[in-house]
Amino acid sequence: MRMKMFAAESLEAAKAMIFAEMGDDAIILSEREVPGGVEVRAATDKLGGGMVPSGSGIISRIGAPLTPRLTDNPLRNRVRDALLWHGAPQRFAERVADSGFASDTSVTDPTAAISAGLEKHIICRPIAPRLENDILLVGPPGHGRTAVAAKLTRRASVTKSEVLPVAADLDSTAGGAQLAAYLEREQDQIRSVSTPDALFETLKTIRDNKQRCVIDLPAIVPFDQEDMASLQDLIPVIKAEPVLVISAEGHPEDQADMAKAFARCGIKRAIVTKLDVTRRRGGIVSALSSAGIAFAHLAVTPFIGGGLVPATPNRLAQLLTEDAPAHVALRGAA
């Protein structure tokens, strides 16, 4: 027989965890109330891979006090379960949950616990409104690069600094017209180029005038070797910081593969989009963490004005607290 202790907010929640892991044949051995919830000990005759002994029998027999295990903390398990609900991989959810309580086991707020855990596993580096470098926006098709280019341009104008939008329409998809529409400008007010030579000439003029720009590059398919090779060749020639624009939508493993592919091309920062239409956001957080890419901004509304929020562990934690709406992290958008 194998035994295990389960911790949850309620007896019903604990039983659900027990039967999900041990099966319908599990037997409840004991239950007791603890701060923040209940602890329930259960047993089964099945030797499943997830079964672990509930404690050291030798230590118990000699009378030594048992050290409380982190996995017996109901709030810690709530943090883990919230991340799992959001689609985060099991190992990432466990690591964040453990890290959230590693330095302070007295934490009582789930958001604070998630935030503390994320601080150990992610990097946040927002882009300043007054750009230090030109920005080259890259990303897969349909992830919102052009909208982000417009948002960065609008954000700069609000803070009394100028950022010039450049549509690198190298694939002839009318990117300039779309960018102009987002910014409510005439198309001749947008710097739109259709060839690499025209792009380099435009960038030279902008830099000679000591101005900064945001370049909206055509979509890159991260699983296409030719696309990624072209991007890798282009980045050092353009001499602008490449920033990944990636949607919160999608399968966590696909997101992880995409993030790692762009990281291999030298991308260090990302702007996460479509958080307003995505309920489960754990996959993208884990993906960027595993790829070593820093969070720059979060796009939590479709509107061009006020559409970007500087990324922080606390803002991400608010988005990962179970079924949290995106607007909880909107404060501070620019």
Task: Give the positions of each predicted feature.
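Short hydrophobic alpha-helical runs that function as membrane-insertion/retention elements
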Residues: 7, 26-30, 164-166, 189-193, ...
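Pre-Walker A (Motif I) flank of P-loop NTPase domains
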Residues: 130-135
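Hydrophobic positions on the alpha1 helix immediately C-terminal to the Walker A/P-loop
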Residues: 148, 152, 178
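Conserved catalytic-core segment of NTP-binding enzymes
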Residues: 178, 195-204, 212, 220-327
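Post-Walker A helix-loop "phosphate-sensing" segment adjacent to the P-loop in P-loop NTPases
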Residues: 155-164, 292-295
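Non-catalytic terminal/linker segments enriched in charged/polar, low-complexity residues
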Residues: 1-128, 159-161, 329-333
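Conserved lysine of the Walker
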Residues: 145
